[in-house]
From Swiss-Prot:
This is Exodeoxyribonuclease 7 small subunit. Pfam families: Exonuc_VII_S (PF02609). Its EC number is 3.1.11.6. It catalyses: Exonucleolytic cleavage in either 5'- to 3'- or 3'- to 5'-direction to yield nucleoside 5'-phosphates. It is an enzyme of class 3 (hydrolase). GO terms for molecular function: exodeoxyribonuclease VII activity. Signal peptide: none annotated. It comes from the Bacteria. GO terms for cellular component: cytosol; exodeoxyribonuclease VII complex. Bidirectionally degrades single-stranded DNA into large acid-insoluble oligonucleotides, which are then degraded further into small acid-soluble oligonucleotides. The lineage of its organism: Bacteria, Bacillati, Bacillota, Bacilli, Lactobacillales. Keywords: Cytoplasm, Exonuclease, Hydrolase, Nuclease. One of its GO terms (biological process) is DNA catabolic process. It comes from Streptococcus equi subsp. zooepidemicus (strain MGCS10565). It is found in: Cytoplasm.
Length: 71
């Protein structure tokens, strides 16, 4: 059974990919594959952050008006 990884788990995976690529000891084919995987993770993480931001923007103040947050 496949469960979706948490934001933190996906971020950790992206950080590990970046570290491996920065070290430069990855064969070219693997580096390309890791780069592509990293780009997918990056886009997914960005979507998660944007969704969280939209949720936070809708937080209501005590008087019932929406709290505006700078993007």
């Amino acid at each position: 059974m496949s469960t979706k990884k948490t934001f933190e788990e996906r971020l950790q995976e992206l950080e590990a990919i970046v570290t491996r690529l920065e070290n430069g000891d990855v064969p070219l084919e693997e580096a390309i594959s890791e780069f592509q995987k990293g780009m997918v993770l990056s886009k997914d993480l960005q979507k998660t952050l944007q969704s969280a931001e939209k949720t936070l923007v809708k937080v209501m103040q005590a008087d019932g008006t929406e709290l505006e947050m700078d993007a």
